């Protein structure tokens, strides 16, 4: 449920007392749109809400790994068109529900991030093949094949488990699980977001949660973000009542870090954040790992956050710390055509990049 319990005057004067929600067509996306719908109706019972589910480019093209698209607006563009205007039989949208990790940190000027909802478990999940006796990545024999389409996950996997192999696996969650469980499947396990499995009732498939430092999660992972038209004051007022401030502060810091480093959602930046409501302190840890798992930089920073600008500043600070250690060099040197090559048998031990300067303040 949303953390913000502030009651507001319900005189929003929304046209026809109706909110048109848009989202992707996958089962998970529909569930997430329904979560937002329920939150709105709970706060404003006089409003009606409906959900329009559409396929996006990321849904339509399942044969290519995510990195090959460049990671920019892969899940958002088609829906954004309907935020601006009605198209044929499709109604104009008032808002779009996204997994926050899929929303680019730099949105087109016509749109803005309206709010961030309460975060589900942000960690990655290890899902073993049905009937497997293995309980952790460390249990797997050398050369075992792990399924993931995420550069962030595969790079950290190679850093911490260099004897394992990985390959891209696409499709919705159930499709990927079916591929894993097929008796002819080459995969021993999958790496997936815990939040998605939990939201569609498949939390029992989680063999283990992966915590830092073994696996830092993606920027915004586990949180829902709502995209709206820029300057839509009525929607902003409505969404203010369902946002979750601790989640918002953490995710804004994470997104500020990614924006500062100019990294799209398909680059190997991992994070871990926490907001202490008693002290108003936000801590942000982050890691950048080269796709082969050999080079990495990591750092952390903690500071007082009383507003969204403070949260942005934390992200910029961590970005500067990582840059000083060579983080930008890792991101700039990525060759996406080689990301999916398996590690060689003589993979070197992962090494942190020698810092250009040292700054822990």
Swiss-Prot record:
Signal sequence bounds: none
Residues bearing the modification S-(dipyrrolylmethanemethyl)cysteine: 265
Family matches, as SUPFAM superfamilies: Periplasmic binding protein-like II, Porphobilinogen deaminase (hydroxymethylbilane synthase), C-terminal domain
GO MF annotation list: hydroxymethylbilane synthase activity
GO biological process: protoporphyrinogen IX biosynthetic process
Family from the record: Belongs to the HMBS family.
Protein name: Porphobilinogen deaminase
Lineage: Eukaryota, Fungi, Dikarya, Ascomycota, Saccharomycotina
């Amino acid at each position: 449920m949303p953390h913000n319990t502030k009651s507001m005057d319900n005189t929003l004067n929304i046209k026809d007392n109706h909110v048109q929600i848009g989202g992707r067509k996958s089962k998970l996306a529909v569930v997430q749109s329904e979560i937002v719908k329920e939150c709105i109706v709970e706060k404003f019972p006089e409003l009606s809400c409906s959900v329009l589910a559409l396929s996006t480019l990321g849904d339509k093209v399942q044969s290519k790994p995510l990195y090959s698209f460049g990671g920019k607006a892969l899940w958002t563009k088609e829906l954004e068109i309907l935020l601006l205007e009605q198209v044929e039989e499709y109604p104009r949208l008032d808002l779009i529900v996204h997994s926050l990790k899929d929303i680019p940190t730099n949105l087109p000027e016509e749109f803005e991030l309206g709010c961030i909802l309460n975060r589900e478990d942000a960690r990655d999940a290890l899902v073993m093949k049905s009937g497997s006796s293995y309980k952790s990545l460390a249990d797997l024999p050398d050369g075992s094949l792990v399924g993931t389409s995420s550069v962030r996950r595969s790079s950290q996997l190679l850093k911490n488990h260099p004897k394992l192999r990985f390959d891209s696996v696409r499709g919705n969650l159930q499709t990927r699980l079916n591929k894993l469980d097929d008796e002819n499947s080459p995969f021993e396990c999958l790496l997936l977001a815990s939040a998605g499995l939990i939201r569609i009732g498949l939390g029992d498939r989680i063999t283990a949660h992966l915590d830092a430092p073994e696996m830092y999660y993606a920027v915004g992972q586990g949180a829902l973000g709502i995209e709206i038209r820029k300057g839509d004051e009525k929607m902003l007022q409505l969404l203010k009542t369902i946002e979750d401030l601790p989640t918002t502060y953490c995710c804004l810091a994470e997104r500020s870090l990614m924006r500062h480093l100019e990294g799209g959602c398909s680059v190997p930046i991992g994070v871990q954040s926490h907001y202490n409501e008693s002290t108003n302190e936000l801590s942000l840890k982050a890691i950048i790992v080269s796709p082969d798992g050999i080079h990495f930089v990591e750092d952390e920073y903690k500071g007082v956050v009383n507003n969204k600008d403070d949260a942005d500043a934390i992200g910029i600070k961590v970005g500067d710390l990582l840059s000083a250690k060579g983080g930008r060099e890792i991101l700039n040197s990525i060759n996406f055509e080689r990301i999916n090559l398996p590690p060689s048998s003589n993979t070197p031990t992962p090494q942190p990049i020698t810092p250009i300067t040292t700054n822990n303040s």
